[in-house]
């Protein structure tokens, strides 16, 4: 029964049920809220409406051909299912769940023929007598055709295969997969170990790995038929070597763990958890990680799949190498690690499915960080940065490259020959630690040498489909191993992206993807200490130190020379003795312009109005052989003559115009000439010297004594009445046009009258 009626409880129930549950079971789960006899009918109706809204927001109702209605989770919430939700529910309290099977029922085999099993794309018939019902009491009897049609997927009859939903939930993988009640008897599970092996896409692990476990745990069981025969039927030249035999610590058969029902069997959880611990203790022997990495509950592969010791990598890589070449994929080549610390393992019994949402939110910043680093590593043409922790070696690169065939890591002196299988470096995605922890795993050199293999795909971190669909290009591996605690320092020290231009050291040869997979180390302190250089391997194999362009790291604040700074300060303050002293030390300072206002020494002297300083500067420039431009313009277009006119320094104006021949017709950025800045206190000689126009009063003249005669007042009223303000040019032209029209009409009338008088 449900503990509350909420959106979270409904979504949690659907996720635990595998994303698909019968309508009757869903109503029965929330029966205490929908049919509470102690609640009024109005409240019950309100609860029903609210429940319908909850269901419609996250799921849809679909009907099978037999009329059974199922509530199916929408695709946008499929990421919440994880590894638990993709598995089928097991029997609860001994009740079979045969009615929930949607894949086609197997046809009844003829006498003397075994069951046809479809594993790994090959069909085999195991010869043997048909067991009688007395010999195997738990064997399923043939059901009627109605029950078989009820268990089939609707898409099988139309398209010949199950729909995407059934394939994701693992209900249409193979026609010979037994129902959950077939797995209750240990004898049946021992006789058919290959049937108990789930699909690789559902459980996140290859099916043959689970079959190997079942063969080890089951006493006296028939060895699995699939690995040698199925691979030979698929066209593989060699058969995969089996895992090294180990004594089975438990004499119980392996049962298929499912998490699709709302309540799991406690005994089944304990047994599965115990077998997991024993298997990890025997095979992996991996210590608990110091920093718990966030887990993606919806991904097929666990986040710590890179954490592999040598023996596991050897066994899995050997078996993966014998798989048929067309079946090679990213999921088949990367092994799965069963770690006790992984939250996605069903034995831990997570409290709620919504931890996947929390993990998704916690990984949001990391995905953005990895995406930015991948984008920066793709666009930049430089090689690895210098290694942190070796400051005494100076500019020592992380990978000292003599050729593309052999790479050497100076951190732990790990040699990576080209013929070896890829070396996987575990990458802890924890946020709480400041120091990154790395585990380097040596691999066997000749594990893949005797079998031709496709190139190993480039590693990339899986993210949800909605996030990965935004970018059209493939992400390259990240250039850093974790988020640094000081993000601001990391962002400041990062090199800005450059345009994709050919490097000066030559075009870099594309390395073999299957040669080595090494995650580069990065540290914010090391990057900040050496931001202007990088090591780039050239064509001949030697590494070269290529400095970056200084323009990319130029600060927006341009530092001034000490003498230039003092020159500007002394000119602005009017300290002419210090100005002349600096001038004789460096005469070129007279041509220096202020970076803010664009003023030169002539501008500052004209602004202050010091005539003696101007004469000394001009004479000193003539002696030093420096040609002063008296018409130089500032940032606002002012010449020294403009500034002298603005401040009313008549002596400086006369010296600039008469002796230095400064031009008086230059306009500034406002379009004004120097004489337009003169005030009324300036003499007429200065006005004429600056070329002011003649014949017009420069300043308006008003009569001191105003006339009070009535005739003058009436005349002024008439003038003011006739002068009106027009709102637009069209109105003004319209009035003028009317005047012209009336005048022309008056002339026509007048001439006609004259003609009439003349005719009389």
Curated annotation (Swiss-Prot):
InterPro entries: Ankyrin_rpt, Ankyrin_rpt-contain_sf
Basic and acidic residues: compositionally biased ranges: 191-203
Pfam family, one: Ank_2
Modification Phosphoserine, positions: 132, 239, 728
Ranges for region Disordered: 82-152, 171-268, 370-396, 445-512
Residues in ANK repeats: 597-626, 636-666
Keyword line: ANK repeat, Phosphoprotein, Repeat
Basic residues bias (residue ranges): 460-473, 492-503
Record field: compositional bias (Pro residues): 238-250
Biased composition (Low complexity): 379-394
Tagged with keyword Transmembrane helix: no
Family: Belongs to the SOWAH family.
Protein name: Ankyrin repeat domain-containing protein SOWAHB
Species of provenance: Mus musculus (Mouse)
């Amino acid at each position: 029964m449900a503990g509350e009626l909420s959106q979270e409880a409904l979504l949690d129930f659907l996720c635990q049920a595998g994303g698909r549950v019968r309508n009757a079971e869903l109503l029965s789960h929330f029966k205490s809220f929908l049919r509470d006899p102690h609640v009024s009918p109005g409240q019950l109706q309100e609860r029903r409406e609210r429940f319908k809204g909850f269901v419609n927001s996250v799921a849809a109702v679909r009907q099978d051909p037999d009329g059974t209605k199922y509530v199916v989770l929408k695709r946008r919430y499929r990421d919440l299912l994880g590894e638990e939700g993709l598995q089928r529910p097991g029997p609860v309290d001994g009740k079979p769940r045969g009615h929930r099977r949607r894949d086609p029922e197997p046809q009844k085999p003829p006498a003397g023929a075994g069951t046809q099993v479809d594993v790994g794309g090959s069909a085999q018939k195991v010869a043997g007598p048909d067991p009688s019902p007395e010999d195997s009491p738990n064997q399923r009897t043939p059901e009627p055709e109605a029950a078989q049609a009820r268990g089939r997927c609707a898409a099988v009859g139309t398209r010949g295969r199950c729909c995407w939903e059934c394939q994701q939930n693992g209900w249409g993988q193979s026609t010979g997969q037994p129902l959950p009640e077939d797995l209750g008897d240990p004898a049946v599970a021992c006789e058919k170990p290959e049937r108990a092996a789930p699909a690789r896409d559902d459980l996140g692990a290859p099916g043959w790995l689970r079959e190997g476990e079942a063969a080890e745990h089951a006493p006296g069981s028939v060895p699995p038929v699939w690995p040698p025969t199925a691979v030979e039927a698929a066209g593989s030249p060699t058969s995969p070597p089996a895992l090294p035999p180990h004594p089975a610590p438990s004499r119980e058969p392996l049962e298929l763990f499912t998490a699709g029902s709302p309540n799991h069997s406690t005994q089944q959880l304990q047994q599965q958890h115990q077998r997991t611990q024993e298997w990890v203790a025997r095979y992996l022997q991996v210590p608990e990680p110091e920093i718990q990495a966030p887990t993606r509950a919806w991904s097929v592969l666990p986040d710590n799949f890179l954490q592999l010791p040598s023996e596991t990598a050897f066994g899995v890589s050997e078996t993966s190498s014998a798989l048929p070449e067309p079946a090679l994929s990213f999921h088949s080549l990367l092994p799965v690690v069963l770690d006790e610390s992984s939250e996605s393992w069903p034995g831990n019994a997570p409290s709620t499915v919504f931890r996947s949402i929390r993990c998704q939110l916690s990984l949001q910043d990391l995905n953005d960080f990895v995406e930015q680093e991948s984008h920066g590593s793709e666009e930049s043409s430089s090689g690895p940065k210098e290694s942190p922790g070796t400051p005494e070696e100076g500019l020592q690169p992380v990978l000292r490259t003599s050729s593309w065939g052999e790479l050497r890591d100076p951190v732990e002196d790990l040699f990576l020959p080209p013929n070896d299988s890829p070396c996987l470096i575990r990458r802890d995605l924890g946020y709480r630690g400041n120091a990154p922890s790395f585990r380097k795993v040596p691999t066997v050199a000749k594990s893949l040498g005797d079998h031709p293999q496709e190139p190993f795909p480039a590693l990339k971190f899986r993210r949800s489909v909605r996030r990965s669909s935004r970018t059209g290009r493939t992400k390259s591996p990240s250039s850093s191993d974790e988020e640094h605690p000081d993000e601001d320092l990391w962002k400041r020290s990062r090199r800005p992206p450059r345009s994709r231009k050919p490097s000066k050291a030559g075009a870099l040869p594309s390395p073999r993807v299957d040669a080595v997979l090494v995650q580069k180390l990065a540290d914010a302190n090391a990057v900040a200490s050496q931001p202007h250089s990088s090591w780039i391997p050239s064509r001949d194999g030697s590494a070269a130190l290529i400095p970056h362009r200084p323009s990319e790291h130029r600060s927006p604040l341009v530092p001034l020379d000490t003498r230039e700074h003092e020159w500007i300060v002394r000119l602005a303050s009017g300290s002419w003795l210090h100005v002349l002293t600096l001038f004789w030390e460096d005469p070129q300072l007279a041509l220096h312009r202020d970076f803010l206002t664009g003023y030169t020494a002539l501008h500052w002297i004209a602004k202050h109005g010091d005539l003696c300083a101007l004469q000394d500067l001009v004479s000193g420039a003539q002696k030093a052989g420096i040609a002063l431009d008296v018409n130089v313009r500032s940032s606002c277009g002012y010449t020294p003559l403009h500034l002298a006119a603005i401040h009313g320094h008549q002596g400086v104006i006369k010296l600039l115009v008469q002796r230095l021949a400064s031009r008086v017709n230059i306009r500034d950025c406002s379009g004004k000439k120097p004489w337009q800045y003169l005030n009324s206190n300036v003499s007429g000689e200065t006005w004429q010297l600056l070329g002011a126009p003649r014949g017009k009063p420069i300043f308006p003249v008003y009569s001191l004594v105003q006339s009070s005669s009535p005739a003058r007042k009436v005349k002024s009223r008439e003038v003011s009445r006739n002068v009106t303000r027009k709102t637009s040019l069209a109105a003004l032209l319209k009035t003028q046009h009317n005047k012209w029209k009336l005048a022309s009409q008056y002339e026509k009338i007048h001439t006609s009258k004259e003609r009439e008088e003349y005719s009389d």
